[in-house]
């Protein structure tokens, strides 16, 4: 694997020798005869150097990892992989982390190759699945690999778009499963953001897949300028100021703009005057009493006026910086911003554009949703904002509405999209400017600052290739803002990629279904998670060797003629540890009886007496050089403790993933999903039972809990509506986190739904205890918060009536319902279910899936 950084421009041919010029000529001739050249010839633009090199490497038979900024043109390499597959009459799969990206790429490829040659697989959508080119989510490909699908037979190229998504806690592990399990005949094309440890990632791919070419480009095709927008007060117009000072050529340099800093100082003074606050008199020590700097008596600093959202949009429109994306880290904030712009009377569209917007919206909505659903989703309000040139874009919207926004923005009809950060993930919506409202966001537990990677992902949308000469990234002045923070975020364009891989129960049985126990452990040792752990373990290994050498030196220094001084120091260390920690540990230990507690303290006291006696009677205590030896002995003891600490860390890293797998196998064996076998030579193997075969077909965050509930007859007394309602707890994730209860249990608290829910909770708690006992992370708790909502929906209720009185958005409901329908369908097809009544339950699950997957949920647009 080699790293190549690229910039435009070729070496000066006049500096080459005749032989070098001839070699260069031959290389050009060979390239002209290549598939890469045939692919590039009809393109309306010249390929960048990094694109050419990546394409050449792919054609030569290498795996390729391309790391480049947003908008640099990474997808050209993916397009060439598909072109190459078509030319060689083999299959290519294009995988994405989210369904919205899959849907977008599917339409792009259909435009090029036609609907007969392109398929789409996203779990709830299947179009032309046996096509030569199939776009899919990564989970679908993972499932195909485990099922050994015949669709994989002619597969030779897999594009992993947004491969840095591998770091995602919930879905990232699937990427590693795919990279590890793909047949070696398949070449991988990975498209990644510019992460700081991309060489490590590429080296790992090479260790698993073979020859891998890493191609890096840090060149942005459209330069990006950084700005800050401020506003003195609500009566004045906002001002857009450069974050960095400009050089003699008018380009932004790397030093902060003094004009910006001075202007912020002026606004600080104005805010202080407005609040009637005077500057602290340092000579009088104001605010520096016993409380120190910022003592309690200090009046809070007056805050500068925060620019109004509508005023920001109005100013950017005046400056010709639209179309733009305004990032606000709150769904409600996005919707409020659009409403504020409308209420302020802003209009960004012409009469001709309004006509086009109405036509496109009517075309996209026609036949998709009922008038009742549209009313529940406040469609008329959504449409009016579009006609004015504004739109929200966030996960709380249904897929159809987001697709309408994306289409209108791409066609230049919607001029300002107000979005949460989810829009920054891959969706092709470049803009002239990007506005970031704050440099911090709420992460579910508290407000945290943006990382350089997150900031780059957001601002990378600014600057449309072939349209704009400059892109603009604008930070809105806000509470606590200082220019240095924005500068730190914008100057660090890369961030590290870390694995989130961990074995799961479903993964374990799928591995053991296709390989023996030891092979499965070796496979897990190939994960990027273990690669990273090994990298840090190697550093610890060096530290361990250094400590061991130091200890050997100390042992020579305190060598004693009277006895074993190392043994003497070990006695003293043990005695010190027990005297300091022994009683404290026993005080916090739980005993069944007072007698047990008393006996434990008696044993501790006896052990202390024994150690004191052994230390006092040790022959080294009579050595005349005892104090000199103790000087070295104390150093030896300190380094011995450090060696133990480092060794523990080393042991926890080496083979850590395989050890998690062992723990999972222990749990599954105890529950009857696996059978353990050991031959005469001590070799261990694991085989799947009937229960294990069921678990193998359940892909869910709650895979084991669901199987245990099925096998325990938890759902036997439910009808289709009740089954859908109870199982919603395994797919619903409340936005505020934590588990919750429904407003009511259909049938009452003593009815079958409430009883089944209680049983399911108990099963989940039991599995949590098992995981904790085996040192594994606890499972996510089931959340019954929308059980009543999903029951009403399965019973035929309208979207409006189901959501009435809840704070759930249409988009959240649809997404949860789609996931529920997927789980129900998995149960329906997991034949034969290995328990009495299994056939009936499978039929019930199929009926429930049909009841859930209707109306707005069944809309073919992916979510």
Q: Residue locations for each model-derived region?
A:
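Helicase-associated low-complexity/disordered flanking segments
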Residues: 1-56, 60-64, 90-91, 245-249, ...
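Conserved Walker B
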Residues: 141, 162-164, 414, 423, ...
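Conserved interdomain linker/interface between the two RecA-like ATPase lobes of SF2 helicase motors
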Residues: 180, 187-189, 194-340, 391
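Conserved segment of the helicase C-terminal RecA-like domain
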Residues: 187, 429, 433-443, 448-489
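Conserved C-terminal RecA-like helicase domain
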Residues: 93-95, 103, 110-119, 278-296, ...
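Conserved P-loop/Walker A NTP-binding site and adjacent catalytic elements of P-loop NTPases
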Residues: 44-230, 324-328, 335-349, 353
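Gly-rich Lys/Arg/Thr-decorated short loops/hinges at beta-loop-alpha junctions or inter-strand turns
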Residues: 32-38, 154-161, 290-295, 381-391, ...
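Non-catalytic terminal extensions of ATP-dependent helicases
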Residues: 2-6, 286-294, 300, 309, ...
């Amino acid at each position: 694997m080699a790293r190549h950084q690229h910039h435009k421009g070729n070496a000066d041919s006049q500096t080459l020798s005749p032989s070098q010029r001839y070699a260069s000529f031959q290389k050009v001739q060979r390239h002209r005869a290549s598939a890469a050249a045939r692919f590039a010839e009809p393109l309306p633009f010249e390929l960048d150097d990094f694109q050419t090199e990546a394409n050449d490497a792919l054609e030569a038979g290498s795996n390729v990892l391309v790391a480049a900024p947003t908008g640099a043109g990474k997808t050209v390499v993916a397009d060439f992989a598909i072109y190459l597959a078509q030319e060689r009459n083999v299959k290519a799969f294009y995988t994405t982390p989210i369904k919205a990206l899959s849907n977008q790429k599917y339409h792009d490829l259909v435009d090029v190759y036609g609907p007969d040659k392109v398929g789409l697989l996203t779990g709830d959508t299947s179009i032309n699945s046996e096509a030569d080119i199939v776009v899919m989510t990564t989970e679908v490909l993972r499932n195909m690999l485990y099922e050994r699908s015949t669709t994989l037979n002619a597969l030779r190229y897999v594009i992993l778009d947004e491969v840095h998504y591998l770091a995602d806690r919930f879905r990232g592990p699937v990427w590693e499963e795919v990279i590890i399990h793909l047949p070696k005949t398949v070449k991988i094309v990975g498209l990644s953001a510019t992460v700081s440890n991309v060489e490590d990632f590429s080296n790992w791919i090479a260790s698993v897949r073979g020859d891998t070419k890493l191609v890096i480009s840090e060149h942005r095709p459209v330069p990006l300028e950084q700005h800050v927008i401020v506003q003195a007060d609500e009566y004045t117009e906002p001002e857009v100021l450069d974050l960095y000072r400009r050089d003699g050529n008018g380009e932004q340099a790397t030093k902060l703009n003094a004009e910006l800093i001075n202007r912020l100082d002026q606004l600080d003074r104005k805010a202080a005057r407005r609040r009637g606050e005077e500057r602290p008199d340092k000579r009088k020590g104001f605010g520096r009493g016993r409380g120190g700097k910022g003592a309690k008596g200090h009046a809070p600093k007056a805050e500068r006026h925060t620019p109004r959202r509508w005023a920001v949009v109005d100013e950017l429109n005046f400056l010709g910086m639209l179309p733009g994306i305004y990032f606000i880290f709150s769904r409600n904030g996005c919707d409020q911003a659009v409403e504020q712009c409308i209420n302020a009377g802003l209009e960004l569209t012409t009469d001709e554009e309004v006509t086009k917007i109405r036509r496109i919206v009517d075309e996209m909505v026609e036949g998709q949703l009922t008038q009742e659903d549209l009313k529940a989703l406040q469609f008329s309000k959504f449409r009016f904002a579009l006609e004015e040139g504004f739109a929200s874009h966030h996960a709380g919207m249904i897929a159809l509405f987001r697709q309408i926004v994306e289409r209108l923005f791409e066609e230049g009809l919607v001029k300002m999209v107000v979005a949460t950060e989810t829009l920054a993930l891959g969706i092709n919506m470049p803009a002239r400017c990007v506005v970031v409202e704050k440099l911090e966001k709420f992460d579910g537990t508290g407000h945290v600052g943006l990382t350089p990677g997150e900031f780059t992902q957001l601002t990378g949308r600014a600057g449309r290739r072939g349209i704009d000469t400059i892109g603009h990234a604008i930070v809105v002045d806000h509470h606590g803002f200082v220019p240095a923070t924005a500068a730190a975020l914008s100057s660090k364009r890369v961030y590290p990629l870390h694995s989130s891989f961990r074995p799961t129960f479903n993964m374990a049985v799928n591995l053991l279904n296709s390989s023996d126990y030891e092979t499965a452990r070796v496979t897990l040792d190939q994960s990027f998670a273990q690669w990273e752990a090994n990298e840090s373990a190697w550093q610890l290994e060096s530290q361990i060797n250094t400590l061991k050498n130091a200890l050997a030196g100390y042992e020579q220094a305190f060598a004693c003629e009277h006895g074993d001084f190392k043994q003497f120091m070990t006695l003293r260390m043990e005695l010190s540890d027990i005297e300091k920690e022994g009683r404290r540990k026993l005080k916090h230990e739980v005993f069944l009886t007072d007698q047990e507690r008393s006996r434990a303290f008696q044993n501790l006291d006896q052990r202390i007496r024994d150690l004191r006696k052994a230390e006092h009677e040790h022959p080294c205590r009579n050595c005349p050089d005892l104090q000199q030896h103790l000087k070295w002995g104390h150093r030896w003891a300190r380094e011995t403790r450090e060696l133990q600490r480092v060794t523990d860390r080393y042991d926890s890293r080496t083979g850590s993933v395989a050890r998690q797998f062992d723990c999972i196998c222990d749990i599954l064996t105890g529950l009857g999903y696996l059978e353990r076998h050991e031959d005469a030579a001590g070799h261990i193997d694991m085989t799947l039972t009937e229960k294990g075969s069921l678990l193998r077909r359940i892909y869910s965050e709650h895979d084991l809990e669901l199987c245990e509930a099925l096998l325990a007859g938890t759902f036997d007394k439910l009808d289709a509506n009740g089954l859908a309602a109870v199982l919603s707890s395994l797919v619903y994730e409340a936005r505020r986190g934590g588990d919750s209860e429904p407003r009511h249990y259909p049938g009452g608290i003593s009815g079958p739904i409430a009883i089944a829910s209680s049983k399911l909770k108990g099963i989940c708690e039991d599995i949590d205890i098992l995981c904790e006992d085996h040192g594994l992370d606890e499972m996510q708790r089931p959340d019954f918060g929308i059980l009543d909502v999903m029951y009403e929906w399965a019973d035929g209720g309208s979207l409006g009536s189901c959501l009435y009185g809840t704070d759930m958005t249409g988009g959240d409901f649809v997404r949860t319902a789609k996931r529920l329908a997927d789980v129900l369908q998995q149960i329906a097809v997991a034949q034969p279910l290995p328990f009495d009544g299994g056939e009936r339950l499978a039929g019930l699950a199929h009926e429930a899936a049909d009841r859930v997957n209707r109306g707005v949920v069944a809309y073919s647009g992916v979510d």
